[in-house]
Amino acid sequence: MADQEFDIDAYFASQSEGKSVVASTPENQHCGFVAIVGRPNVGKSTLLNNLLGQKISITSRKPQTTRHRIMGVETDGNYQAIYVDTPGLHIEEKRAINRLMNRAASSSLSDVNLVLFVVEGTHWTADDEMVFTKLQKANFPVVLCVNKVDQVKDRNEVMLHMLELSKRMQFVDIVPISAKQGKNTDVLKKHVRDHLPKAVHHFPEEYVTDRSQRFMASEIVREKLMRFTGEELPYSVTVEIERFDYNPDTDGFHINALILVERIGQKKMVIGKNGEKIKTIGREARLDMEELFGRKVYLETWVKVKSGWADDERALRSLGYIDDL
């Protein structure tokens, strides 16, 4: 096997299919829940956004970007897949927020019809092994999604990695993908449809996510915070939307976002020299919101120090982290 070159591009081309054009009726509908799981930073949120054809889950190069379970719905003719993008499962549980994120991810595995197990190319860690062990013990059909294959120089290594994992667990399908480039996600959608049970659709065809515009606004601000700040902040910052109003006079949304950090040094980091960093964060967040909401957005941001919020379950409950459990 090692002497044969595995042509992933040919594999993409040979299996890609278009969307269904069959009219949907209750008698022939298929619908099911699909959990997207994996360790932090393997591309789960990018994959969800690609599968849905629009951005509903924030992405970042930093691990543990997703803190909540995000539900996205993709309807294609008779088939409706209800995807759940989970926080990355990880071994480290020192803080209350980390424990809650693990619980949120684990609880997403209850009552699902299919699991997409996302791994990063040929890179395998202790966190991957932990997720793998959980899936071995669970009684769910699992599709192995080997993501970021475009970043692996030796394509034979990808094939060998898939073969090794398939020896340890019986996957219903194994699909090499590049979620960022959209490579092979049509093939993955086909495999998902093949495993959806016959059932009436849960949501209207135009429905995309269960998350409110208020929630999406907070996630967009948090994404920009992670994009424009250092490595320390993802675990120590959250965003609370204190105001989210539509004003018919301006035909726009007026949004007040409170950024909570744990230390004064972090506050200074977010604000930046002469307030330049918080201005950049606010501007980029506002542009994304306007694109998502389709209206003018008037965004104001504040930064406040709230020591120990990530270890305070009452604070986490008020911020919506425990509602996911």
Swiss-Prot record:
Residues 85-88 are annotated as: G3. Residues 177-179 are annotated as: G5. One of its GO terms (biological process) is ribosomal small subunit assembly. One of its GO terms (molecular function) is GTP binding. It holds the Pfam family MMR_HSR1. Its main location: cytoplasm. Residues 64-68 are annotated as: G2. Residues 221-307 form the KH type-2 domain. Residues 30-198 form the Era-type G domain. It is found in: Cytoplasm; Cell inner membrane. The keyword Nucleotide-binding applies. Monomer. This is GTPase Era. The gene is era.
